[in-house]
């Protein structure tokens, strides 16, 4: 197994989750973050520099709060009867392995082919199996034909779906984007969508499309989880909001 290009940023977030897992009172437990770190090191990947590590530590409270919020979102979606989940740009978070999924759930993970290959090979070599009933990796470039590849992988466009868009701020910074057009097109009534976004543009657009939307700011979220930290965290989440939407029609 080789380490794919672009994996360093995903490893940086994995380092933040690994750190939170060892906190005195962690928001979540992610034993798989260390699996990815070890797999990357064993294949000659350089971990982030000291300067980058300092920046990671500086946004640790924000990153941990974000992870917790998306974890709770998926658990709530399952409790409300949704059995089809999609994570867009899943990165190296092993939610398919670490969350307590409802029996019968199918989880699709969309990401670049190299990232998914690295992720699944690392976990397989470590002897890990998904906790979700059906896990389906979908290798795709988000700029080209991802929704077609998702359908080809078995995605049911008639079934209400819980979507998550996390860590894609450059793509969703200015409101409606082709990504959300496509999600809207293949999401029937009863579907849910969780988005980490900059500003309220995404929330405003979803509201016009018939989604019921709630929004919480990053600072409020960190306070809720007892992770309201230093100035770096404050700067990181200054304009970030977390959007939770349900499609009624």
Swiss-Prot record:
SUPFAM superfamilies assigned: S-adenosyl-L-methionine-dependent methyltransferases
Regions crossing the membrane: none
Keyword Cytoplasm among UniProt keywords: no
InterPro entries: Ppm1/Ppm2/Tcmp (IPR007213), SAM-dependent_MTases_sf (IPR029063), SAM_mthyl_Trfase_ML2640-like (IPR011610)
An annotated GO BP: methylation
GO molecular function: methyltransferase activity
EC annotation from Swiss-Prot or TrEMBL: 2.1.1.-
Binding positions (S-adenosyl-L-methionine): 111, 141-142
Keyword set, alphabetical order: Methyltransferase, S-adenosyl-L-methionine, Transferase
Protein role: Exhibits S-adenosyl-L-methionine-dependent methyltransferase activity.
Protein name as it appears in the record: Putative S-adenosyl-L-methionine-dependent methyltransferase Mjls_0570
Organism: Mycobacterium sp. (strain JLS)
């Amino acid at each position: 197994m080789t380490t794919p290009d672009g994996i360093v940023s995903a490893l940086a977030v994995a380092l933040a989750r690994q750190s939170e897992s060892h906190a005195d009172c962690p928001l979540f437990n992610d034993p798989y973050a260390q699996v990815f770190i070890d797999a990357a090191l064993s294949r000659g990947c350089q971990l982030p520099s000291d300067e980058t590590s300092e920046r990671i530590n500086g946004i640790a409270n924000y990153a941990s709060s974000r992870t917790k919020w998306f974890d709770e979102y998926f658990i709530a979606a399952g409790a409300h009867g949704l059995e089809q989940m999609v994570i867009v740009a899943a990165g190296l978070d092993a939610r398919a392995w670490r969350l307590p999924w409802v029996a019968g759930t199918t989880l699709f993970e969309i990401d670049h082919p190299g990232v998914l290959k690295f992720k699944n090979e690392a976990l397989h070599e470590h002897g890990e199996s998904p906790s979700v009933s059906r896990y389906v990796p979908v290798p795709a470039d988000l700029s080209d034909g991802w929704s077609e590849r998702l359908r080809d992988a078995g995605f049911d466009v008639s079934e209400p779906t819980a979507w998550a868009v996390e860590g894609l701020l450059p793509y969703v910074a200015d409101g409606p984007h082709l990504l959300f057009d496509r999600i809207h097109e293949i999401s029937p009534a009863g579907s849910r969508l969780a988005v980490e976004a900059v500003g309220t543009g995404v929330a405003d657009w979803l509201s016009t499309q018939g989604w019921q939307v709630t929004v919480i700011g990053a600072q409020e979220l960190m306070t809720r989880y007892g992770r309201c930290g230093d100035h770096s965290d404050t700067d990181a989440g200054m304009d970030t909001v977390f959007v939770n939407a349900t499609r009624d029609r």
